[in-house]
């Protein structure tokens, strides 16, 4: 059976993609210069948080994921980042190819929350490979790529931030249930608010002059049947 090894040699943000996308440069090596007709790969990418240090601000941002820093010895577990498929074309011995990984800025996804909390340095990644190889010099042979094939890589945090800024410059992104979105739309229309930023600031009582729906202390006190109750109901939070 052909022995395969994998290495990640770099990563870049794809500035021409329709959505946030990272492109990892992958080197695939077949032992003894074996002839490979094609390689159908499955790649699982994990973040390994325990393989880097964190500043105080980063630790605060990660508390929702891993709890208090004193507990990190047991809670700093791997986080799933992506799972993608790749078809590698014919090669002999060694080849380099691109592994395209679509990403999300959904703050409900653990990997996104982790990456957003980082201020600098590198993201420790582990790529796990499996799949099917079609090999043979004078014929055609089908072989499995065993599950123990892997490659470690440290992705610069700046690459992630560059990718996000290309698609969401200066912005964040959250996912809401449809009924909550309908409630927000109704609230925005009823109060003739010109933007989503203004809508959320009004709900938070952050209009700068104390004239919005918030009280004197800046805390929102929604009236009966106000759409904000739909927000608190969908998120599991209690009303002020």
PLM region descriptions:
Residues 1-23:
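Low-complexity, acidic Ser/Thr/Pro/Gly-rich terminal tails and inter-domain linkers that flank the onset
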Residues 31-39, 193:
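A short beta-turn/strand-edge loop motif at beta-sheet boundaries
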Residues 41-48, 96-148:
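Internal, hydrophobic beta-strand segments that form the core of beta-sheet-rich folds
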Residues 46-57:
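Short aromatic-acidic-glycine turn motif
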Residues 60-69, 134-173:
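Short beta-strand elements
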Residues 61-116:
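Extended, solvent-exposed segments with strong compositional bias
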Residues 178-195:
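Surface-exposed, Lys/Arg-rich phosphate-binding patches that contact polyanionic backbones
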Residues 194-225:
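Short, basic amphipathic alpha-helical segments that act as recognition/interaction helices
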